[in-house]
Structure formats: C-alpha cells, structure tokens
C-alpha cells in the first residue's frame, strides 16, 4: 500500500458515510494525483461543508495544506487553527511540544505514527496545530504519520460507540437503528437505480420502505416490527442488480 493510499484510508475512516464522503474521497484522490492545485478554493469548499466535525475539517485542511503546493505567504485558515488548538487546554499544548520534539527525530511515516499513538487525541491535534501554524517543521512523511495516528484514535472511539449501539439490549434503540438503516438503504437504492425501465421496481420497493418507516415513526410501533426491514430491502436491491448485470459482493 502506498503512503498516500494509507493516508486516504485513515482520513476517510473518520468521515461519516454519505454523499459528502464520496465527494471528499474524490477531492483527496485529485489532490494526491496533483490534479487539484488551488489550495484556497479547496479550503473554502471544505470550510462550508455541513455535517463534518470541526476536528475532521481541521485534519482535512491540514492534509490539503501539506499536499497542495502553495505560495509561501498564503494565509493560514482560522477554522483549521481553531480545530487544531487542543481545545485550548495548556496540558495538551505541553504534551504536543514534547511529541513534536520526538517527531523531529523521526524520519519515517510508520516511526512517526508509532510514536504519536501513545498520546491523547487532544495532544495530537495540538501538535498538528503547531506544524500548521509554522511554529515547527517536520517532513511531510512524518506529518502524515501524525495525521494517521490521530485518525486511528478517532476511528477507534467511533467504532467503540458504534459497537455499543449495535450490541445494546435496549429495544427502542435497536428499533430506531433498524429504521434508520432501512431508510438510508432505500435512499441508496433510489440513487443507484437511475432512470432505466428495470429500475422502476427497485425504486418502488425503496419508496414503499421509506413510506413504511415514516408511518412507523408517526404512529409509534412495537420495537420488534422493524426486524428484517433492512435485510428485505437489501435482497430486493441485490435481485435488481443481478438483473442489471451488476455484481454486488457485500452491502450489509
């Protein structure tokens, strides 16, 4: 796996699924391929994206700044600086300075990532802030190691939270989670269906599923009534894709 592929993988792991994630993936690919060289326009686009947390925007802004060649005097962006200040906690800043001194001695991506993983997310963000604000310099490879360590920590906590939700025994949360998944699956089906005649059936199924979820939420239903809803939808989607000659390996 190349370095840039690894960076893209880690960064995308902290972006919530949805159309925006696909857009960000495309932007990252373009940047890494040297196709997008307008850093200012890229940062303006990033700043106005909805849904993303300030820290995720800060990390993406840091990655874009590291990768896109820019004029020396280009202004640093406030939204990135604010996201990478470790919540203004002096403790984070002290640790960030210690980490920075260690990173200065590293020359490889993996070495830097290994060192960084033993620090808290706040300290890692502050250290990125130091580098972003030109208070310190490290090689691009080392900076990417720092980015990936931060993303790994964030993804770990997101995974833990997700696992807790999936394994919860609370029937109301499970019920709502199944309805949300069914609704987003239906939306994906509608987007993938396109406008061909064969798509009409898939569109109909998706539309019915969304109406059903809406009705279930409106009138309030027994928590077990949503069981199997998403799986039924996926079966329909796979059948439709088979007819269209599209092989879908795994969607669940």
Curated annotation (Swiss-Prot):
Database matches in SUPFAM superfamilies = Influenza virus matrix protein M1
Membership in a protein family: Belongs to the influenza viruses Matrix protein M1 family.
Q: Which gene encodes it?
A: M
Q: Locate the motif Nuclear localization signal.
A: 101-105
Q: What's an example GO cellular component term for this entry?
A: host cell nucleus
Could you tell me which species this protein originates from?
Influenza A virus (strain A/Equine/Jillin/1/1989 H3N8)
**Which coarse location class applies to the principal site listed for this UniProt protein?**
virion
**What function does this protein fulfil?**
Plays critical roles in virus replication, from virus entry and uncoating to assembly and budding of the virus particle. M1 binding to ribonucleocapsids (RNPs) in nucleus seems to inhibit viral transcription. Interaction of viral NEP with M1-RNP is thought to promote nuclear export of the complex, which is targeted to the virion assembly site at the apical plasma membrane in polarized epithelial cells. Interactions with NA and HA may bring M1, a non-raft-associated protein, into lipid rafts. Forms a continuous shell on the inner side of the lipid bilayer in virion, where it binds the RNP.
Q: Which GO terms describe its molecular function?
A: RNA binding; structural constituent of virion
Instruction: Specify whether RNA-binding is a keyword of the entry.
Output: yes
How does this protein sit in the membrane? Peripheral membrane protein
Indicate whether Cytoplasm appears among the record's keywords.
no
Report the locations given in the UniProt record: Virion membrane; Host nucleus
Entry's Gene Ontology BP terms: viral budding from plasma membrane
Other facts noted in the record for this chain: Most abundant protein in virion. When expressed alone can form virus-like particles in transfected cells.
Q: Which UniProt keywords apply?
A: Host nucleus, Membrane, RNA-binding, Viral matrix protein, Virion
Region Membrane-binding: start-end pairs: 1-164
User: Which HAMAP family does the record associate with it?
Assistant: INFV_M1 (MF_04068)
InterPro entries reported for this sequence: Flu_matrix_M1, Flu_matrix_M1_C, Flu_matrix_M1_N, Flu_matrix_M1_N_sub1, Flu_matrix_M1_N_sub2, INFV_M1
Query: Can you name this protein?
Result: Matrix protein 1
- Supply the Gene3D superfamilies for this chain: 1.10.10.180, 1.20.91.10
Q: Subunit structure of this entry? A: Homodimer and homomultimer. Interacts with NEP. Binds ribonucleocapsid by both interacting with genomic RNA and NP protein. May interact with HA and NA. Cannot bind NP without genomic RNA.
**Which residues does the annotated region (RNP-binding) include?**
165-252
């Amino acid at each position: 796996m190349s370095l840039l592929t690894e960076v893209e993988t880690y960064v995308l792991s902290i972006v919530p699924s949805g159309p925006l994630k696909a857009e960000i993936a495309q932007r990252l690919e373009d940047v890494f391929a040297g196709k997008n060289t307008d850093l200012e326009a890229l940062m303006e686009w990033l700043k106005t994206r909805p849904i993303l947390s300030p820290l995720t925007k800060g990390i993406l802004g840091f990655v874009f700044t590291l990768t896109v060649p820019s004029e020396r005097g280009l202004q640093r962006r406030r939204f990135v600086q604010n996201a990478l200040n470790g919540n203004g906690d002096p403790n984070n800043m002290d640790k960030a300075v210690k980490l920075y001194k260690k990173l200065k001695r590293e020359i490889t991506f993996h070495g830097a990532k290994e060192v960084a993983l033993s620090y808290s997310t706040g300290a890692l963000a502050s250290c990125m802030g130091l580098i972003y604000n030109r208070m310190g310099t490290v090689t691009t490879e080392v900076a990417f190691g720092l980015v990936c360590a931060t993303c790994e920590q964030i993804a770990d906590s997101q995974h833990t939270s997700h696992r807790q939700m999936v394994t919860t025994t609370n029937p109301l949360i499970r019920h709502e989670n199944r309805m949300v998944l069914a609704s987003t699956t239906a939306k994906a089906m509608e987007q993938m269906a396109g406008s061909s005649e064969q798509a009409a059936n898939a569109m109909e199924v998706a539309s019915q599923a969304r109406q059903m979820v809406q009705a279930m939420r409106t009138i309030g239903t027994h928590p077990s009534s949503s069981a199997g809803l998403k799986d039924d939808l996926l079966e329909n989607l796979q059948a439709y894709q088979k007819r269209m000659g599209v092989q879908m390996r795994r969607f669940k």
